[in-house]
């Protein structure tokens, strides 16, 4: 799969783990204003009562700050933070080891909880609801059930695919939080903060140019900033200007809306091979030689949010914005079909 090597992939990479660039409090955190305001209330209320915070579920595309927010929550609650991910917890014993080592009110963060083993998920239910572990010891006729009391903890989980969570698991989270893509203005603040922490001079226009191409995602903004810094330093520039940022990102094949070669292949394939759509996701995946999950989780969310494609019951359809971006004219019959659809919706 080619996707992890993409500069604009929102998935985690080693260079993204620089904790010095991460905000350390909710006040330092830029964006997600509604979510932050609500979390502040819930955290303060839990601290005042001396209780564990209700379990929290973060939902949203990768790279929007779910892990960072979980770490900040633990810090502001004044408790320990433990982190893992759904695929890592292979069996019930793995989960039991994590839970039994938690202290009172600690935060356990599980990323990609939608990929949790179903057998492990069953063990998690009583742990979340009653703070007890129900384990089966032994096999066959000698097997017996053992209950283990747990410290009252807070589970903070993250998922990019809410629809893949079972209803019993989803219903056990008292605080669901949906995160959305960031505005260019918010990303500009994030880029300027990152540049300041890197001791990198940057102009307002330079920061905005990077922000415009970051696909609404702070993780991508930080990665683009690092690469632009490389170009600026080699060019011995006094500061990152709009021109330097534009030249660097253009050379890195990131266009003015944050699309790379794979995004353009996606749009071109629908436009050229299928007349703008509709075309099914399995056909797109086969044509791009990319897994369906990568297309639905990585490529499409930002395109849909920006209005480049529509998901319809019959498949994906390019919008007028996409045709304009490609520099192509949509087929006449497609324009007529979209006009009829617009009239029906209104």
From Swiss-Prot:
Question: What would be an example GO MF term here?
Answer: four-way junction helicase activity
Which species does the entry assign this protein to? Rhizobium leguminosarum bv. trifolii (strain WSM2304)
Write the protein's name: Holliday junction branch migration complex subunit RuvB
Where does the chain bind Mg(2+)?
67
Q: Which CDD domains match?
A: AAA
Q: Which portions of the sequence form the region Large ATPase domain (RuvB-L)?
A: 1-182
Function description: The RuvA-RuvB-RuvC complex processes Holliday junction (HJ) DNA during genetic recombination and DNA repair, while the RuvA-RuvB complex plays an important role in the rescue of blocked DNA replication forks via replication fork reversal (RFR). RuvA specifically binds to HJ cruciform DNA, conferring on it an open structure. The RuvB hexamer acts as an ATP-dependent pump, pulling dsDNA into and through the RuvAB complex. RuvB forms 2 homohexamers on either side of HJ DNA bound by 1 or 2 RuvA tetramers; 4 subunits per hexamer contact DNA at a time.
Q: Which residues bind DNA?
A: 292, 311, 316
């Amino acid at each position: 799969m080619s996707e992890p090597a993409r500069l604009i992939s929102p998935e985690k990479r080693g260079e993204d783990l620089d904790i010095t660039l991460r905000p350390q409090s909710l006040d330092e955190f830029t964006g997600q204003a509604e979510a932050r305001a609500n979390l502040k209330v819930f955290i303060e209320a839990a601290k005042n009562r001396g209780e564990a915070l209700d379990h929290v579920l973060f939902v949203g595309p990768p790279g929007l700050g779910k892990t960072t927010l979980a770490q900040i929550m633990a810090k502001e609650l004044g408790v320990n933070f433990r982190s893992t991910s759904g695929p890592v917890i292979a069996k019930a014993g793995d989960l039991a080891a994590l839970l039994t080592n938690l202290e009172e009110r600690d935060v356990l963060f599980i990323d990609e909880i939608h990929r949790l083993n179903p057998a492990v998920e069953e063990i998690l239910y009583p742990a979340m609801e009653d703070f007890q572990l129900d384990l089966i010891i032994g096999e066959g006729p000698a097997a017996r059930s053992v209950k283990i009391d747990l410290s009252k903890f807070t589970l903070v989980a993250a998922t990019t695919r809410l629809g893949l969570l079972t209803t019993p698991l989803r219903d056990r989270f008292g605080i669901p939080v949906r995160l959305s893509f960031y505005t260019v203005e918010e990303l500009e603040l994030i880029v300027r903060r990152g540049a300041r922490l890197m001791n990198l001079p940057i102009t307002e226009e330079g920061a905005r140019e990077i922000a415009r191409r970051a696909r609404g995602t702070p993780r991508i903004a930080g990665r683009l900033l690092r690469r632009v810094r490389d170009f600026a330093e080699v060019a011995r520039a006094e500061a990152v200007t709009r021109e330097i940022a534009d030249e660097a990102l253009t050379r890195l094949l990131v266009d003015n809306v944050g699309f790379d070669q794979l995004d353009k292949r996606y749009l071109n394939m629908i436009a050229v091979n299928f007349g703008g759509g509709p075309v099914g996701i399995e056909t797109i995946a086969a044509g791009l030689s990319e897994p369906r999950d990568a297309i639905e989780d990585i490529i499409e969310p930002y395109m849909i949010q920006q209005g480049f494609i529509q998901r319809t019951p019959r498949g994906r359809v390019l919008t007028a914005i996409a045709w304009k971006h490609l520099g192509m004219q949509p087929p006449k019959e497609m324009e007529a079909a979209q006009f009829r659809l617009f009239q029906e919706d209104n």
